[in-house]
Amino acid sequence: MREDYKYSIITDFEDGTECNKLKNSLIGTINSIGILLGNFLFHIIAGKFGYKNILFYFHIGHAAFLLVSIFWDNYYYFQVINCFVMFFTKCILNSSLVMNNEIVDLKYKAMISSFVNSGLGLGGMFYVLMYYLIKDWRYVFIVGVCLSAVSGIIIKIFFHDSLIQSLINKDYDRFYNDLLYIAKMNGREKEFKDGIENDEKYKNCLQKLKEYTQDSKSSTKVIEVKNSTNRENDDKLITSANKENLPKQENNSKEEKKEIKGSLLQIFKYSSVRYILIILSVGWFCNSTLFYGLVIGIKTLKGSQYRNAAILYLCDFCAYNISGFFSNSKLGRKLSLQIFTLAYGIFCLVMFLVFDKNKDVVVGFYFCARLSMICGFCVYYSYAFESYPISVATYGYSFNATCSSIAGVVIPFIIEYIKEKYVFLIYAIEGVVCTLLFFFLKETRGKEREDNIKEIEEELNKEKNKGNEEDEKNKKIILSENKNL
């Protein structure tokens, strides 16, 4: 096998060109660029299309690009196509993780998330087995095309979108359709529709949802509701006197809704979430250098590559399930993160110390480092959503994941230009640094998530109280004038 394919799953391409360090490094970054774009654009795509649509259409796109790649004989064209494949793959993975965190019960979220993620390890072992038995990568890709297409169809038929995300985006039509879909899947569609048509509670809820989508009418309705007392004549005077202020109230309503929707800039602006973003971004970057580095370095280990790759993915499968138990136990998310990051730091330090003395020990600790690192990764996924308020959770996660993708772009250059022994020392330092940084994080296990950033909530409450005081003051003035009349 030539050095060209050090970072590729393909082992039988031949283009007759010579290899160099820069070329090897660039080849290693191509897949990571697709992952980087998938993480960076994820919050935009999710806000526009919803998680269910991403899972369906991107599975189909993933299958289509895999199918196209089979017919390309040029190695470099293939790598460009593979970049798009990784883009679809990362968006699919992100959507799956987000949907799991939003539709699963809080008590069992981490355990179910870990069980679902363990499918990545099973998929890796299945891929290694297929490649070992079939040998020809094209036939392996055909199996991948079929599996991806079937997965997309199953998701389209049997899954519903995240109700939380529909409410955050003020998309009440999608929210209603998802409720109807859930009723249909449980065989209660007729009962649901009859309830909407006949039950006053359902009608009122549906009417409220429709009112929230009409900004221009919301302020007058609020005034009518607030002033529905026995003093009808006084209320008419108050309503007419406040008509001049209605445009201002409408603008405030729109600004308030805009703030509640959330953005990445809000995370950078407010300190209560900014420090979480920075710490998790550093942690994900460090963890990802080890994640991508251990995958690339598997071909340099002693023994059969197929055996080593199978053990690597077996470690992934075990790690996801182990992390679910630890993070959901009394240890909690924060302490679990510290234990796993410190563990892989120690394992990498041992590999650095014995690298030139005993290769068998290096192989053993190599898989131990992989096991503990994947355990930490799985806790990251749950912790990221629980630590951010709901309004900005997708933005925070997307930024953290983007930082992890940057590690995938950088690590091939580090491995190519730095001696392998000292790469393990870098991993060890990263593990210790992350462990120390996590002391500044807060525990999230079993705690309800906040709807909005704390500072924004305080600002909105102040404005609301100020507006109520002004309304009361104006009301007293108008009532006193009315009495004089």
State where each predicted segment sits:
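Central cavity-lining transmembrane alpha-helices of secondary-active solute carriers
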Residues: T29-H43, A310-S323
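Conserved MFS/SLC helix-loop-helix module at the cytosolic interface between two early adjacent transmembrane helices
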Residues: L37-H59
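Central mid-sequence intracellular linker of multi-pass
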Residues: K135-E224, A428-G467
